[in-house]
Amino acid sequence: MAYRFEVDRSNCINCGVCMDVCPVHALDMTRTLSPSIESGVGGSPTRDQQPWMMEFPIQSGECIGCELCSVECPTAVIQITAIHAPAELAAAQGPIRHGPESETGWAALSEYTTESLRELHTDPWGDLAGWRAARRQESWQVWRTWNTDGEGTDRLFAPCQEACPVGTDAGRYVALVGEGRYAEALGVAAEYNPFPSVCGRVCTAPCEPACRRGVMDEPIAIRELKRFAADHGMEGYPTPPPPAQRRPERVAIIGSGPTGLSAAYQLVRSGYGVTVFEAMPVAGGMMAIGIPEYRLSKQVLQAEIDRILSLGVELELNTALGRDISLDDLKRQGYQSILIATGATMSQPLGVAGEDLHGVWPATLFLKRVNLGENVTLTGDTLVVGGGSTAMDAARSAWRAGASSVRVLYRRTKEDMPAQHEEIRAAEREGIVIEPLVAPVEVLGRQGSMTEVRCERFAIVGKGADGRNKVAPVPGSTFTIRARNLMVAIGEAPDPSILPEGSSIQFGEWGCLLTDSETLMTAQSGVFAGGDVATGPKSVIEGVAQGQRAAWAIDRYLQGLPAARYVPLWRSRAPLPLTDRIVLDLANRERAKSELAEVSREDRHGEVSLGFAAERARAEAQRCLRCDVVTSCQLVEVKRTVSV
């Protein structure tokens, strides 16, 4: 019999079960070497593939049509159809006998045998102990996963890890949570990221859209599980060991946001002396003064900052670049390298008449005053212009500060808002109204204070290159909204006053410091820049990744090594040898949701999202398909409790 083997690659989770159960070794999950149309590089992905996905070369002459691969495929993506049936082939192969089923409905490979003249009552490949791990190591990990730039690496990584800017091995810490090993889970989550608790609360979670579980039902709640690991694993989590050797060089880092402190964390662990200079009276950058406490507890943030400082990082507060110190001052003090990580703290203006009236606030200034503990009280109706996280934070904080009503004006559709969906839902749950396709054109007032805002409506006129809707003003659609306060949250930019006029370090067209794209070095040798000051506003996790990269570049510079292409440390780590059984739970279960606290105006600071209880966290973690380790595990067991 000859067969046609078809795979829906968009729904394949790369578990390798099909290769395991094939009794005649007809399946080999290796990447084909034919060049793709787009890149011309052998083995690189085509347009309909994820970079890490595998092809499925089939030895069709060996296939006996038993359909074990199709039956056991956890996502039901394999179809086998007969195309012709030469009698001699069918007779030579003989019938297939299924081994006894386990309670889960899946039998190990050694329990399947062929019965033929050649292989009577024997396993196809003799002793199978260790076969799965060895064969997968040969078939999968010597092939290459191709990144968008066409460069290959010698390992495959789970899609969640590929999507994380710092390469957090989410699959490992999720699995450890599922086993109740919380301190170990925290150790994995903090391996490259000194802010697991912070990111467990406010990360944009790019790992979750990449999660293959989302193909079946819903993605794993990876961010919430990181928070759970951080909240419950700290007691047994050891302090990182001191560096193997102390180096004589000293590094000055200007700015204590996620980039600055992430770089400090990496550099001090490499043995360098590190001092962080912060302009504000508190450390943490925008994590401390830009994110409200109901989303990120100050106690949680300070605990992670203290952990970094405990490694030997020195911190000087109320010390601003351009006001209290200069780059030349730091060089005279003996710092051999400097990292500028001052962020993007200046709110972009609306550019409309009347925005200088009393009652018009830069959203970042409002949030800063609230987070520094000032007793900011609002009265009357409040408008917020913008659609990102800053706009949502300002709107929800305005409601807590006493505003009688809060409306968010956004010139595109609600679906186009860059804020996370849960932020928008949380704002609406608190009574905040989202007004899409509306933007202000003038602020009106009397006696120096604003009284109303003239707005116009917009309409969708097509799609932009970024996939978002393009909009245009609707002629004759202007109207006014009475309001006492207007928060402007349409973007932030770096503060140019940090550098003197005539400095060789320049700001670019978009207001960011110019740096070498690979090394992050500025025009001054030994002076680097990273984070929002060099990239524009990004998320916390992207800031942490920038700090990781800056630390790598500074380390190479101080060692006198030549400039090189940046390869994150996590990409060079060897996979863990695995011999334990992995259980894939394919029961259709809803994604777990965080418990929410009752919200009141009186409680301005209590966290709204309370995270998971232990039972819920472990159940959610056990939904993971373990894309991170199926390439090296000797046995994958599938709970086939439902059809998928």
What are these regions (language model features)?
Residues 358-363, 429, 455-463, 501-529:
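Flexible glycine/proline-rich, aromatic-decorated loop/lid segments
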Residues 253-277, 316-328, 346-349, 365-421, ...:
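Rossmann-like dinucleotide/flavin-binding elements
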Residues 231-238, 318-321, 362-370, 466-473, ...:
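Short gly/ser/thr-rich secondary-structure transition/capping motifs
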Residues 1-62, 70-247, 298, 340-357, ...:
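Ferredoxin-type iron-sulfur electron-transfer modules and their immediate structural context
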Residues 97, 276, 280-311, 315, ...:
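Rossmann-like dinucleotide-binding cores of NAD(P)H-dependent redox enzymes
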Residues 317-333, 437-449, 457-461:
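A conserved short coil-to-beta-strand element within the FAD-binding core of flavoproteins
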